[in-house]
């Protein structure tokens, strides 16, 4: 819960308190009038289909203490408002939301961990939160609250009792992660990989790597970067770290290294060497299949290690991890079928990981992959889908069902591959 005056908020967002009592309290923030409760500050954000300015009256009815609105809207356009209802006029309500979140973050004692990457960032974020929760009070991104609107709303849930905030950072264009980092001011930056996600928007993997590097560049001198040592493009980002950095992976040069990896139908386990020294008497288990989850788990352990958590506590935290909805979610269906729901989002790297995890879980059973179109791949779309068809065959998938014109290229490629 927040507890600021309207005057304090107006100053923080660089706006003008045009109506209402300067001493009125702001207890929360909302962008949806249906989610407003007593004391909330309603941010009237313009959207493609609806404009928040049309719902200020509903926010009043729901008990909001005020609204942040654009200076382009005349005061009388909101109808008859209560005398005590605050109106803060700003140039850009979305930017004002980010400013309030950044100001609030600076008043809290919590450290901030930022997580980005082309694939695996949600799973890695959830694993980091699970590991840290063994020793700290943790706030973590929920659902898809990882953009210029969701991240500020998450930060505004930060309380004095929180020790750490683990924030997922997504992007669709250069500069977006830099803007998120300006708001969140991360102390730790985690980059999982550089793949083909959004290559249709950014143009090349090099451009994607540059965008991901914005998180590392934003770290303070006392912060540290946690980077996937198995991805050459991520390793190259290390040179941008203002402070300390470490690599995680399976290679000997990685500071946090997995050894003795064991894959089973239901989980993935491994031992760990830290700076070349084996962690004795502790084995780490991720309760989901998939070799890629070794790397996700190592990222979480690297953060936990740097924040001083004991190995035994980290092992307990990692074992408690549960995936978010529609991300490698296992559903037991009738007649002995297992449905693996990984439908939230897809790019070539994440689909390969899903296929590998399904085959690992299936053991001797048949695996049928259902593949839809992967979007925002630009010029790489045709090749990306075709390569997945080949990969499915060579990996051992028994059948492939495709939906959509791009996914049909995967089916054609699978037939040609046998």
Model-derived features: where do they sit?
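Residue-level signal for inorganic ion chemistry
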Residues: 9, 40, 59, 100, ...
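Conserved beta-strand scaffold positions in the cores of enzyme catalytic domains, especially
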Residues: 17, 87-89, 112, 138-140, ...
